[in-house]
A protein has these predicted regions:
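Short, conserved catalytic/metal-binding micro-motifs enriched in Asp/Glu and His
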Residues: 4-8, 20
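Short acidic-glycine-tyrosine-enriched beta hairpin
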Residues: 126, 156-177, 324, 338-359
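A contiguous, mid-protein "functional segment" used to position or interact
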Residues: 190-235, 371-415
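Intrinsically disordered, low-complexity regions enriched in proline, serine, glycine
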Residues: 134-136, 154-155, 162-163, 193, ...
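Ligand-binding loop in jelly-roll beta-barrel domains
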Residues: 167-168, 176-208, 322, 349-350, ...
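Histidine-centered metal-chelating micro-motifs
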Residues: 130-133, 151, 170-172, 176-181, ...
């Protein structure tokens, strides 16, 4: 990787324009843009150039320094990259912000990230008392609270109900077609949603209750709720409540005449109270939440992963399908290998999502020297499964591995027979 200091090296690459006998110093591309507020930052940071391993040349035009700084592996891919791999990364910072009174929603859809046909994601933000209105979906919903506390209320088709306060780190799972509502409890509340439908924005996937009532004849509504024909009870249903609107934090309890969704039937999982499992490789820890400990989660499952500085999620693949990822904090890089010489390396930071194709080989490395990496691994399955490259080689006759890879038998015999999951950085 070649990095060029802004202050030290830009003058060496400047262009001199002569007009009417005078000399004018060429202004860097990033200074000609309407980004004056970023100039102090750019002046102090190094400007990346597409030059490495004796290849490439300095950029003259079309340079977006901020994006290139976040994606060094795109500017200077490793020499091991090759073939054709589509873009597998998206950032919520690029998503259209759907603002309502009391919050906003930012989505990552198949139209944003075409390989993400199995999953869509959404960041939801609610202020105190604001309500993500009563609704249901024709797909499954998996939720993860990233900040604050939200009240989730749900009812199943047998009339069993559940009301829970989900705090940062907690998870919920709403099966397809089951109604629910979410309300912000603290001053600022945010949660991530994952849906097992890449085309989530299409019609027929979300059903808001106010929309239904305002498109139903008034006499039918009164008959449905057993009200007198002269009743005005439903005359003021808002025709455009929106996905989110302001409100007051609910404090009334509700009866459960048909039982509650508790125990193995619970749609809420307090993962914040769950201890991290230390990875055998010593490079971090993880929380696995799937149907083995959260039985209702039959279509979407996941892992919360913490990788220590310079640690690495070992080389592996997932035999049961596509992996969708959300990077909550930290910086990372990953090379996704699709077979037949096709491989591409990506860089990730806060708010990025990714999709790794079915059975593709990959690793995820924390590129920071000081900060932990936190990210989510999500799967369209009832269990989390992975195959470790190290374990596979270690549990195969060593002389076979030696012949295939042209490494010594002693090296193969020294490999750990246990999955390392997350490897520690070497001193």
């Amino acid at each position: 990787m070649a990095w060029v200091s802004t202050q030290a090296s830009l003058p060496e690459h400047r262009n001199i324009e002569r007009t009417a006998g005078t000399e004018q110093t060429h202004v860097p591309v990033w200074k000609r843009r309407q980004t004056r507020h970023l100039w102090p930052v750019m002046e102090k940071r190094e400007v990346p150039e597409p030059t490495a391993d004796g290849l490439g040349a300095p950029e003259d035009e079309g340079q977006n320094v901020a994006i290139e700084l976040q994606n060094p592996s795109a500017l200077n891919p490793p020499l091991t990259d090759g073939g054709l791999v589509p873009n597998l990364k998206w950032s919520f910072a690029l998503s259209n912000n759907l603002k309502d009174k009391g919050g906003y929603i930012r989505e990552q859809l198949e139209s944003d990230l075409p390989p993400s046909t199995d999953f869509a994601g959404a960041q939801n933000h609610l202020t105190k008392g604001s309500i993500r209105q009563m609704h249901w979906h024709s797909c499954s919903e998996w939720g993860y609270v990233t900040n604050g506390t939200v009240t989730i209320s749900m009812v199943d088709n047998d009339g069993r109900n559940q009301v829970a306060n989900a705090t940062a780190g907690d998870i919920w799972y709403f099966p397809k077609g089951q109604p629910h509502v979410i309300q912000g409890v603290e001053d600022s509340n945010e949660y991530l949603l994952v849906f097992d439908a890449g085309d989530f924005a299409n019609e027929g996937l979300t059903f808001n209750v106010d929309d239904w009532l305002t498109h139903t004849p008034a006499e039918v509504i009164l008959k449905n709720f057993g009200l007198d024909n002269r009743s005005t009870a439903f005359d003021h249903v808002p025709p455009n409540f929106g996905s989110i609107n302001t409100g007051k934090v609910a404090d009334e309890s509700v009866d459960s005449p048909f039982g509650q969704l508790t125990g193995n039937a619970s749609w809420y999982f307090p993962a914040s109270k769950m201890e991290f499992t230390q990875a055998p490789g010593g490079g971090g820890s993880y929380k696995r939440v799937d149907s083995t400990n959260f039985p209702v989660s039959q279509k979407i499952v996941g892992q919360i992963v913490r990788v220590k500085p310079r640690g690495m999620r070992e080389m592996h693949w997932h035999p049961n399908g596509v992996e969708w990822l959300y990077f909550q904090s930290g910086t990372a890089r990953a090379t996704v290998w699709l077979g037949a010489g096709n491989a591409r390396t990506f860089d990730f930071t806060d708010g990025d999502t990714a999709v790794f194709p079915d059975n593709s080989g990959h690793y995820i490395e924390n590129t920071s020297d000081t900060d932990d990496l936190f990210y989510l691994e999500i799967f369209n399955s009832d269990v989390v499964e992975d195959v470790s490259l190290i374990q596979w080689l270690a549990l195969t006759p060593p002389d076979l591995v030696s012949q295939v890879l042209n490494v010594s038998v002693d090296v193969v015999k020294a490999l750990s027979k246990e999955k390392q999951v997350i490897l520690a950085a070497k001193p």
